[in-house]
Regions:
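Extreme N-terminal starter segment of soluble prokaryotic enzymes
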Residues: 2-3, 8-14
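Glycine-rich, positively charged N-terminal anion/phosphate-binding segment
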Residues: 2-3, 19-92, 96
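A short alpha-helix capping/helix-coil boundary motif
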Residues: 6-8, 63-68, 107-110
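Glycine-rich, proline-tolerant flexible connector loops at the mouths of alpha/beta enzymes
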Residues: 44-51, 102-113
Length: 113
């Protein structure tokens, strides 16, 4: 079974980790230009928000440029169907990987799933 781009990375590798309110699209573009990590993650995006009325605002967090590749979209939700839809959206948008946030220590996020 192929592990995709992960198999091709030299080790150790440098990753721009997903950080809420930090790794938005403009920040990632600056980092791609001056730091060029081996892997870039989006900040986490609420799958609930994407499909329950906040699509236009949240999809902006999923914009990326070719310079950011490989790029991984990170989502969170407690609803498996919404996670599936978010993953399908990430595939449509051309992401190289999908990450499910299952352990955010932020209390306000914990309550949301």
């Amino acid at each position: 079974m192929s592990k995709g781009f992960w198999e091709k990375l030299n080790k150790p590798f440098f990753v721009l980790a997903p950080m809420a309110d930090v790794t938005d699209a403009p920040f990632r573009r600056v980092i791609a230009k001056y730091g060029k990590p081996d892997v870039t993650y989006t900040e986490f995006v609420s799958a609930d928000g994407l499909f329950l009325g906040g699509y236009d605002a949240l999809v902006k967090d999923l914009e990326f440029t070719e310079d950011e590749r490989p790029i991984v979209a990170q989502f969170f939700t407690s609803d498996p169907e919404r996670m599936k839809k978010a993953a399908e959206l990430a595939v449509e948008l051309g992401f190289d990987g999908i990450d499910i946030n299952m352990g955010c220590p932020d209390r306000s996020i914990e309550k949301q799933g």
